[in-house]
């Protein structure tokens, strides 16, 4: 006691009684907590016979299955201390089988009863047994003893049952059978044949790739891991813009100026179809379950019809919004017989539904045809123009500030794709859509795919020939984002000059036109050049870069001019060696976009009357 303090007793005057049921289910033992210690008292309880009759149907199945009921070779205990078990199931995860119901006579002189579970017989104690040992101390002679096999083999005759106990045993047998049946129904092994997905309607995995997935699931991340599975993208579908682009691999009509590229051979398409075809399984093809019907849209007019699809301008009857309906044509080949849906179209749908960026076309959903229509439609936002059509309608090239505005939007959208490990593999003016608000959006992900690290071999039959980089023309199969940057350089040159930079008529002619402007490469300029399959061809020797002559800094006869910084950007994008080619991040941070004239605001970009 502190000096000068008052000695105050710590004992409680009023005794607080708290009676709690034990968690082991005993109903006859209570705890009374008072000032300093806990007293355990035995509360008077009704006769065993009454409890057996009243509580026979309320015994816990789990307690029985765990062996915590009276069973063979059990140590007897006075009847007045026999415990009843709570019907509350404390641990439903542990499921066991009911032991045998035969009884044996105890070899011990003391007629006591102690709970012996299956785990106790095996030499283990359950958590409830430990709680019982701590909460209710018993004499040492009441400790559970493991019976021998000889004792377990002894059977107790039915005549030895007490009065009323036979009825109790019958009730218990019925309860246990019902309990085991219910437990078997609940705890049965998972079987896909008996699940609700065994019917082929839908599955959890298919629900995740449902075409009605919310836009909140779209990628809004800065990067993805390179080891993630290939994003399923498509080659078959063209952008819904008019087929005015030209060149090899184009799925659109030839341009009005008569420039033509090589036809898109079916063998090239087959090679693209077979590229990583094992990445899709038949279970991932059932993605149209629960989609809306195309009858909920009113078709206004046809925008374009190509080899692989028809595009309509339509109105959503529910929201009254003008959209573009892109009809996916089904082809009869092995993939559709196996999966029921074109592989490349499935890839395109999945990647477009996963992307969320203002410079990438927005695919709202995928709808199915009517009762007699098995076609599938992509519902996309409607934009009035494509860059190829706008360039054909203009009588003069874009100004430098307008080119900067368009290039920044293109690079911004491409940065989003490359950050998410996606290569577009078909960038060209006809795959860039525009609206009357000055916005540019990338579309047509038919050849796009997700790449990883290390780089895997891909098909080189991608990208329209006029915008295809030299490494693909030379037969390279290991490539990454540098192929898109070459296409961006070709688009920039076309925006400045109003005409394609390398309009080759064949792959060989395309290479010759590239080398005629940029110079013929060698091992010093391009390490590894001679190792390409098509590098053995003899090309005219031209050691000089003639690109500056096409885009002079000063012009005395009119036409477009390009500053030093602008030429540096264009020349860096059109570097022959893909390892030295400019990346999208470096292109966005280039000084050309920060010098006068500055990029024009999208609000002040020229508008054009809609043609569709």
UniProtKB/Swiss-Prot annotation:
Catalytic activity, reaction form? L-seryl-[protein] + ATP = O-phospho-L-seryl-[protein] + ADP + H(+); L-threonyl-[protein] + ATP = O-phospho-L-threonyl-[protein] + ADP + H(+)
Q: What are the protein's UniProt keywords? A: ATP-binding, Kinase, Meiosis, mRNA processing, mRNA splicing, Nucleotide-binding, Nucleus, Phosphoprotein, Serine/threonine-protein kinase, Spliceosome, Transferase
For the modification Phosphotyrosine, which residues carry it? 308
Cellular component, GO, one term = nucleus
What GO MF terms are annotated? Answer: ATP binding; cyclin-dependent protein serine/threonine kinase activity; protein serine kinase activity
What positions are modified (Phosphothreonine)? 459
Q: Where is this region: Disordered?
A: 26-60, 239-278
Q: Which organism is it from?
A: Arabidopsis thaliana (Mouse-ear cress)
Do the record's keywords include Transferase? yes
- Give the residues annotated as active site: 426 (proton acceptor)
Which tissues is this protein detected in according to the database? Answer: Expressed in leaves and inflorescences. Lower levels of expression in roots and stems.
Query: What Pfam families does the database record attribute to this sequence?
Result: Pkinase
User: Where does the secretion signal sit in this chain?
Assistant: none
What Enzyme Commission number(s) does the record list for this chain? 2.7.11.22
Q: What's the protein here called?
A: Cyclin-dependent kinase G1
Oligomer and partners: Forms a complex with CYCL1-1. Associated with the spliceosome. Interacts with RS2Z33.
Taking every annotated instance into account, which residue ranges of this chain make up the domain Protein kinase? 297-593
**Any single biological process term in GO:** pollen exine formation
Null mutant phenotype: Aberrant callose deposition, defective pollen wall formation during microspore development, and severely reduced male fertility.
Q: What does this protein do?
A: Cyclin-dependent kinase involved in pre-mRNA splicing. Required for the correct splicing of the sixth intron of CALS5 pre-mRNA. May stabilize the binding of U1 snRNP to this rare type of intron with a GC 5'SS. Involved in chromosome pairing and is required for the completion of synapsis in male meiocytes at high ambient temperatures.
According to the UniProt record, list the residues that bear Phosphoserine. 453
